[in-house]
Amino acid sequence: MKNIRNFSIIAHIDHGKSTLADRFIQYCGGLDLREMSTQVLDSMDIEKERGITIKAQTAALNYKARDGQVYQLNLIDTPGHVDFSYEVSRSLSACEGALLVVDASQGVEAQTVANCYTAIDLGVEVVPVLNKIDLPAADPERVEQEIEDIIGIDAVGAVQCSAKSGIGVEDVLEEIVAKIPAPTGDENAPLQAVIVDSWFDNYVGVVMLIRVKNGTIKLKDKVRFMSTKAETQVEQLGVFTPKSVQKQELKAGEVGFLITGVKELGQAKVGDTVTLVANPATEPLPGFQEVQSQVFAGLYPVESHDYEALRDALEKLQLNDASLKFEPEVSQALGFGFRCGFLGLLHLEIVQERLEREFDMDLITTAPTVVYEVVLKSGEKIEVENPSKLPDIGSIETILEPIITATILVPQEYVGNVMTLCNQKRGVQVNMQYMGRQVMLTYDLPMNEVVMDFFDKLKSTSRGYASLDYHFKEFQPSDLIKLDIMVNGEKVDALSLIVHRQSAVHKGRELASKMRELIPRQMFDIAVQAAIGSRIIARENVKALRKNVLAKCYGGDITRKKKLLEKQKAGKRRMKQVGNVEIPQSAFLAILQVSDK
């Protein structure tokens, strides 16, 4: 056991985490050259394209160190994006050490800081590594200083390497052996193994990635999941190198995969503890929590007969992504669809993109919303995640909205812009620290403001330099009202928004004029109105037009005219008729682009 090293890599998006992992695999001979592809551990196409890691993957590598001993290095790849912070904390809790990979030209960014603090809280040894030192813009001294100022760990003499060209990779491996402690644990104690990740395989069912903390797990053992009390039998054990290699047993300190008869991911929850039925552990390992959805959106198939196919696709995605929640929903405007819960905006985009790419679905997505707590005058408390479900204004005592604490790292010259943006979004400044050339701003922001377009605006006001990390803080009472959009006097439920009273009139006007541009002209005038309760606050008109398809028929047979008229009808089949008005997909997205004043 003293020759095992479990470690993960913490890095901001694009700082070279996956490339470094590739180099380790190549260096330790995990795959031969013809099997090497770039970013071996990022197995989903969308991971490679966006250059982000979503699911944790592992590789167990045998490394012959300079002292002549062979070490087993277990690399657990972590996601770097803020939406997946629970997955990160689970990956880190399975390790004794973490490599903090920082781009030597760009320096420290907010997500690196957040994940690094998570690591330090979990008592993980953090080893700084400067990557991309072969870039002309690299400035290792400045970045070492930044690591010390911002994160507060000693970075003098941090290992320098370039994962792309392979310089210094061996030094990094030596550093892992020297600095990261060996795992502790008792092979003879009752089994405790934490599930670091789980995914669905079409042939064997659920594959769990586990880290054995205490005890030993063998083939054919009967095991129990401690949070759900489900019991099952071990069918396969092994390690990834990153190819899977079968083993007879896994001992304390090792990381590997476990396949049982479980068919549903809901039973193998990330962070749960696995123990033996025959000799169970008394306590589960700490740190397990149910994942809460933060952002909700409606997903509707463009063709209503694709409803079942969409349900199928969502169920298949849920097999690989336990944090995706969904339930059926009916909208008068869009027909049948699903209300889905996500960890954050990136998660929403990824799910949407995977549905379109892997399952070939055509989707309409409504504007993302967050969960509000509504206290009724009767004293009852309800949760509302869909604006169209908000009870009547008369029966509401108060509405509470979720507040998040956001940490923003930004270069000094853009501080003013970012502060203005946060104030526009009803933010409250909590803290501001100068660290070298960077400034760390801490704000309490309403989550409702963040899900719309905060991230894009933050990037544009800071020319792409600001980086953001956030976590949920609490629910706070706020002056919120529901804004309805009416087309031809009928409410379009999918376009309702919950907004703050101050910005309601402005938002209503913006939306109405946006809708006027987007709704195609019809054979009759259309009124687009924005309303708060029964008060109309804005109105726009869409002028009428008519196309005459029979213009080219002089006399001739009636069937010819009928054919042309039928053809005209068929062309309108897909347009969703809302009070006989077709509302295109772009109109539902317009909500996202309404500016706030």
Curated annotation (Swiss-Prot):
Residues 2-184 form the tr-type G domain. Pfam families: EFG_C, GTP_EFTU, GTP_EFTU_D2, LepA_C. It comes from the Bacteria. It catalyses: GTP + H2O = GDP + phosphate + H(+). It is a peripheral membrane protein. GO terms for molecular function: GTP binding; GTPase activity; guanosine tetraphosphate binding; ribosome binding; translation elongation factor activity. It is an enzyme of class 3 (hydrolase). One of its GO terms (biological process) is positive regulation of translation. One of its GO terms (cellular component) is plasma membrane. Required for accurate and efficient protein synthesis under certain stress conditions. May act as a fidelity factor of the translation reaction, by catalyzing a one-codon backward translocation of tRNAs on improperly translocated ribosomes. Back-translocation proceeds from a post-translocation (POST) complex to a pre-translocation (PRE) complex, thus giving elongation factor G a second chance to translocate the tRNAs correctly. Binds to ribosomes in a GTP-dependent manner. This is Elongation factor 4. It comes from Neisseria gonorrhoeae (strain ATCC 700825 / FA 1090). The gene is lepA.
